[in-house]
């Protein structure tokens, strides 16, 4: 017996034959519906997947910009904050900036201290918002100072220190009402404790102050009255037993960024302006970025070229030997995303569609190409986008 939908038993009545035909037609309709549903489900699944990858891509891009903003902050705090605000990564409010500094993730603590110590009105507001984020309730003064002085590195200038310690004293008294008669008392005692820390733990200070001397030094500072002796003894013992930890910069500053590069050396770079001139620059390859400096001693690079989605090729040049180029594959007219510092200190986007570079020797050229190839990272979305652009442009031509 044939086992397919065309087979009709010979002993069926006309009515039964009609019913069988209806059943088979309905079956075909249902199978078509099932297939249509499968296709719709697959389409929705693809949309959900592409939405997820779009979100993921946005997050990746955001994280990269935040990392670049942190590096800029560690080079120049004000420029770093400006970069983060301009790229929508930070709100231009003292509260948002204070929160960013308080979290301190990847930030150089000396740079935090420098920014907080600035004397312009906005920086002072950021300082107060930063201090407000510290919770000093029920901490004795030494404990509060330990917490505060660990969150940044005190700058060297007396006026900056004065502003910061004044803000600290106000916040401590706000969190612990009744401990001191005034913020002035708290301010004076805080300085006395910092000086005590230096005297007790600096090996160059031979004459170590006793607890009695510390108590005597702080007589009459509580609005003319004396502070409880027990309080002063406790503060003295706390500092004697455990010195303040001064934050070492946490390895995310520029010194660390450029400390162990993949490669560094002098190269010639062809300028991107209307007049093409070759300039000698000190190049450092690290963290999937190529940095270039005017001098090896410069703190701040003249330019930063992220290597993501770039390719590298050897090229011949009539003026210079041992040349290679960084370029965007399949997109000869697109400007490479990079930034450079102008002579007046402004950070601007680069205007190169290719970066042409000349090495001193053929061997160095080969080494640079090999190292840059290893550092280049590719974003599959970018390749997909480039392919789509190519397809669109070829469609337009036909």
UniProtKB/Swiss-Prot annotation:
- Changes after translation: Ubiquitinated by SCF(FBXW11) E3 ubiquitin-protein ligase complex. Ubiquitination induces proteasomal degradation.
Q: How does it assemble?
A: Interacts with TRIM23 and CYTIP. Interacts (via coiled-coil domain) with FRMD4A (via coiled-coil domain). Interacts with FRMD4B. Found in a complex with PARD3, CYTH1 and FRMD4A. Interacts (via N-terminal domain) with INAVA (via N-terminal domain).
This protein is called Cytohesin-1
Q: Name one GO biological process term.
A: regulation of cell adhesion
Post-translational modification N-acetylmethionine, affected residues: 1
Membrane topology per the entry is: Peripheral membrane protein
Q: Which UniProt keywords apply?
A: Acetylation, Cell junction, Cell membrane, Coiled coil, Cytoplasm, Guanine-nucleotide releasing factor, Lipid-binding, Membrane, Tight junction, Ubl conjugation
Pfam families this protein is in? PH (PF00169), Sec7 (PF01369)
| Protein localization | Cell membrane; Cytoplasm, Cytosol; Cell junction, Tight junction; Cell junction, Adherens junction
Q: Where does a 1,2-diacyl-sn-glycero-3-phospho-(1D-myo-inositol-3,4,5-trisphosphate) bind?
A: 269-277, 281, 292, 302, 351
**What the protein does?**
Promotes guanine-nucleotide exchange on ARF1, ARF5 and ARF6. Promotes the activation of ARF factors through replacement of GDP with GTP. Plays an important role in membrane trafficking, during junctional remodeling and epithelial polarization, through regulation of ARF6 activity.
Supply the Gene3D superfamilies for this chain.
1.10.220.20, Arf Nucleotide-binding Site Opener,domain 2, Pleckstrin-homology domain (PH domain)/Phosphotyrosine-binding domain (PTB)
The species this protein was found in: Rattus norvegicus
GO annotation, cellular component aspect:
adherens junction; bicellular tight junction; cytoplasm; cytoplasmic side of plasma membrane; cytosol; extrinsic component of presynaptic membrane; neuromuscular junction; plasma membrane
Span of domain PH: 260-377
Report the residue ranges that make up the SEC7 domain in this protein: 73-202
Record comment regarding domains: Binds via its PH domain to the inositol head group of phosphatidylinositol 3,4,5-trisphosphate. Autoinhibited by its C-terminal basic region.
Give the main localization category: membrane
Lineage of the species this protein comes from: Eukaryota, Metazoa, Chordata, Craniata, Vertebrata
Per the record, the coiled-coil ranges are 10-67
PANTHER family to which the protein is assigned, alphabetical: CYTOHESIN-1, GUANYL-NUCLEOTIDE EXCHANGE FACTOR
Q: What is the top-level taxon of the source organism? A: Eukaryota
A GO molecular-function annotation: lipid binding
Give the matching CDD domains: PH_GRP1-like, Sec7
């Amino acid at each position: 017996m044939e086992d397919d939908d065309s087979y009709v038993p010979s002993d069926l009545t006309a009515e039964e034959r009609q019913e069988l035909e209806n059943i088979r037609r309905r079956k075909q309709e249902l199978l078509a519906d099932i297939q249509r549903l499968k296709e719709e489900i697959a389409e929705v699944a693809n949309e959900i997947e592409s939405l997820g990858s779009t979100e993921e891509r946005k997050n990746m891009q955001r994280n990269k910009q935040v990392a670049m903003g942190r590096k800029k902050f560690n080079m120049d705090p004000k420029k770093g904050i400006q970069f983060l605000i301009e790229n929508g990564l930070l709100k231009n409010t003292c509260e948002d900036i204070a929160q960013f500094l308080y979290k301190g993730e990847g930030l150089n603590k000396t740079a935090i201290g420098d920014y907080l110590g600035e004397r312009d009105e906005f920086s002072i507001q950021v300082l107060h918002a930063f201090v407000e984020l510290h919770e000093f309730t029920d901490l004795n003064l030494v404990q509060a100072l330990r917490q505060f002085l660990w969150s940044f590195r005190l700058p060297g200038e007396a006026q900056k220190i004065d502003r910061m310690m004044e803000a600290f004293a106000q916040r401590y008294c706000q969190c612990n009402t009744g401990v001191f008669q005034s913020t002035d008392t708290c301010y004076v005692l805080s300085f006395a404790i910092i000086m005590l820390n230096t005297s007790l733990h600096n090996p160059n200070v031979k004459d170590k102050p006793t607890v009695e001397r510390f108590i005597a030094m702080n007589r009459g500072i509580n609005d003319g009255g004396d502070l409880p002796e027990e309080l002063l003894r406790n503060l003295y013992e706390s500092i004697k037993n455990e010195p303040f930890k001064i934050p070492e910069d946490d390895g995310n500053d520029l010194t660390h960024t450029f400390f162990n590069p993949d490669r560094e050396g002098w190269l010639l770079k062809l300028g991107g302006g209307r007049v093409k001139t070759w300039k000698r620059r000190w190049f450092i390859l690290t963290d999937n970025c190529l940095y270039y400096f005017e001098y090896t001693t410069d703190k701040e690079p003249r330019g930063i070229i992220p290597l993501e989605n770039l390719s590298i090729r050897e090229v011949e040049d009539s003026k210079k030997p041992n040349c290679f180029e960084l370029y965007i594959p399949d997109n000869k007219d697109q400007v490479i995303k990079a930034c450079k510092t102008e002579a007046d200190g402004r950070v601007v986007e680069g205007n190169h569609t290719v970066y042409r570079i000349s090495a001193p020797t053929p061997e160095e050229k080969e080494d640079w190409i090999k190292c840059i190839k290893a550092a280049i990272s590719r974003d599959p979305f970018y390749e997909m986008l480039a392919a789509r652009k190519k397809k669109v442009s070829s469609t337009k031509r036909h």
